[in-house]
Amino acid sequence: MAMAINVKKWIEENTEYFLPPVCNKLMHNQQLKVMFVGGPNQRKDYHIEEGEELFYQVEGDMCLKIVENGKHKDVHIKQGEMFLLPGRIPHSPQRYADTVGLVFERRRLDTEKDGLRFYVEGSPEVLFEQWFYCEDLGTQLAPIMKEFFSSKQYKSGKPDPDQPKAKMPFCLSTEQVMEPFSFQHWLNKHRLEIIQKKCVSLFGDDHETKAVIYGGGESKQSKAQTDVWIWQLEGTSHVTLGNEVLKLGSGDSLLVPEETLFSWTREDGSIALSTSQVPLPM
């Protein structure tokens, strides 16, 4: 049974999970993974996945360390800012105390692999890496980290010449990442356009992340091909799932499961974020 969740209240009720050693809590863990992450959490490992990740800083700032075209780079995401990370870019989130960030990623396709990588200190040279099919990153990381900390590479800080280089299942992205932007400033700038067009995309159609701002209006019944997460930012709306009608007030959210028929009616003055991730054909 679908249920509306007030985001602010949910964060307050789950504060304990945003502290070490856990530092995160999944609100939804289906086709779309909707998670909130806290800190402090400083790390050396870099994660690589084929899909995109969408970041939004709810409270406080964070630093996302990435390797862009062979060069280390820090992406600073401030409170209230949004950032879309392309797939196939090594990244390492650095989070601080008293911060909370919202992160979206999707369930992996059967053909996809994730990588966990460490670099030689201050260098783009790979020190250690492993590739695996990601089902539950939280539990799968521990044995890989344990193997790394007992390895020659960790003890010497240099690659092991006797260790064959891992074969990468795909090439890294050569895309240059975007600059983080203030979500509220974006809303203010596009408010008239949202009212006139009824909906405006944040990132366009050439990304697998479909993040769309909806104003007042109606979305007729259709089937969600993937999970759709709705966050009612202003005003009210009503989502119909079968015979069930759910009212969303300001701050409420709702996950519409994949393959579900639904319709959505938004009152005048409504502003809502709809987020889904549809894997792009390779």
Curated annotation (Swiss-Prot):
GO terms for biological process: 'de novo' NAD biosynthetic process from L-tryptophan; anthranilate metabolic process; L-tryptophan catabolic process; NAD biosynthetic process; quinolinate biosynthetic process; quinolinate metabolic process. O2 binds at R43. Keywords: Cytoplasm, Dioxygenase, Iron, Metal-binding, Oxidoreductase, Pyridine nucleotide biosynthesis. It comes from Xenopus laevis (African clawed frog). SUPFAM superfamilies: RmlC-like cupins. Residues 178-282 are annotated as: Domain B. Monomer. Fe cation binds at H47, E53, H91. The keyword Transit peptide does not apply. The keyword Metal-binding applies. Its EC number is 1.13.11.6. It holds the Pfam family 3-HAO. Residues 161-177 are annotated as: Linker. Belongs to the 3-HAO family. Catalyzes the oxidative ring opening of 3-hydroxyanthranilate to 2-amino-3-carboxymuconate semialdehyde, which spontaneously cyclizes to quinolinate. CDD domains: cupin_HAO. Pathway: Cofactor biosynthesis; NAD(+) biosynthesis; quinolinate from L-kynurenine: step 3/3. Its cofactor is Fe(2+). The gene is haao. It is found in: Cytoplasm, Cytosol. The lineage of its organism: Eukaryota, Metazoa, Chordata, Craniata, Vertebrata. GO terms for cellular component: cytoplasm; cytosol. One of its GO terms (molecular function) is ferrous iron binding. This is 3-hydroxyanthranilate 3,4-dioxygenase.
